[in-house]
Amino acid sequence: MAAIPVDDCINFVGMKFIDNTLYFVADSDENLETDYFGKLEHKLSILRNLNDQVLFINQGDQPVFEDMPDSDCTDNAPRTEFIIYMYKDSLTRGLAVTISVNYKTMSTLSCENKIISFKEMSPPESINDEGNDIIFFQRSVPGHDDKIQFESSLYKGYFLACEKEKDLFKLILKKKDENGDKSIMFTVQNKN
């Protein structure tokens, strides 16, 4: 059996160690791809914390969790239905997503400076970066079939979480606690 030639490979002409990391020097970089995220498709979703509270946008345009029956979710759809855009990731780190809401205007969740807020913007078609404040990695939680967690692509080890602050349950970004932190677990109910 003859070998079939492959045209999409990269020829390496050298190697070198820098600070205990092995780097390859490519013959030509025309086939190399930069790190990026490219938008694929989206889903309308309702997000809930482990107390079954629904994430919604309150009157102050802040993401908070509240007890809410399904009928209220439907009645308040622009504030409770989030648009989860999936992105192709040039690296394999989990499903890259943005979380947006179309309430008053299109806004996209950001964790800039580790503070959760909605930026008035539509998610871009592509992002030429390895990490970005609006990209999160959506992953299943081992041992919990229906639970999801969202890790920041910009701040490794930091996850979206639900935290009680005064009388509100707020969406925050926090460093994952290694002792089975349930505040970073969510259920995602897709509408389409």
From Swiss-Prot:
Cellular component, GO annotation = cytosol; extracellular space
Gene3D superfamilies, per this entry? Answer: 2.80.10.50
Q: Which organism is it from?
A: Felis catus
| A Pfam entry, by short name | IL1
Q: How is it modified after translation?
A: The pro-IL-18 precursor is processed by CASP1, CASP4 or CASP5 to yield its mature, active form. The pro-IL-18 precursor features autoinhibitory interactions between the propeptide and the post-cleavage-site region, preventing recognition by the IL18R1 receptor. Processing by CASP1, CASP4 or CASP5 induces conformational changes to generate critical receptor-binding sites. The mature form is then secreted and released in the extracellular milieu by passing through the gasdermin-D (GSDMD) pore. In contrast, cleavage by CASP3 inactivates IL18.
Q: What is this protein called?
A: Interleukin-18
Q: Which InterPro entries match?
A: IL-18, IL-1_fam, IL1/FGF
Q: Which UniProt keywords apply?
A: Cytokine, Cytoplasm, Inflammatory response, Secreted
Where does this protein chiefly localize?
cytoplasm
- Enumerate the Gene Ontology biological process terms: cellular response to lipopolysaccharide; cytokine-mediated signaling pathway; defense response to Gram-positive bacterium; establishment of skin barrier; immune response; inflammatory response; interleukin-18-mediated signaling pathway; positive regulation of inflammatory response
Q: Which family does the UniProt entry place this protein in?
A: Belongs to the IL-1 family.
Query: What is the protein's known function?
Result: Pro-inflammatory cytokine primarily involved in epithelial barrier repair, polarized T-helper 1 (Th1) cell and natural killer (NK) cell immune responses. Upon binding to IL18R1 and IL18RAP, forms a signaling ternary complex which activates NF-kappa-B, triggering synthesis of inflammatory mediators. Synergizes with IL12/interleukin-12 to induce IFNG synthesis from T-helper 1 (Th1) cells and natural killer (NK) cells.
Question: Which residue ranges make up the pro-region?
Answer: 1-35
Q: Where in the cell is it found?
A: Cytoplasm, Cytosol; Secreted
List site positions: Cleavage. 35-36, 70-71
Q: Does the keyword Repeat apply?
A: no
- The source's domain of life comes to Eukaryota
- What terms describe the molecular function in GO for this protein? cytokine activity; interleukin-18 receptor binding
Could you give the subunit structure recorded for this chain? Forms a ternary complex with ligand-binding receptor subunit IL18R1 and signaling receptor subunit IL18RAP at the plasma membrane. Mature IL18 first binds to IL18R1 forming a low affinity binary complex, which then interacts with IL18RAP to form a high affinity ternary complex that signals inside the cell. Interacts with cargo receptor TMED10; the interaction mediates the translocation from the cytoplasm into the ERGIC (endoplasmic reticulum-Golgi intermediate compartment) and thereby secretion.
The UniProt record lists the keyword Secreted: yes
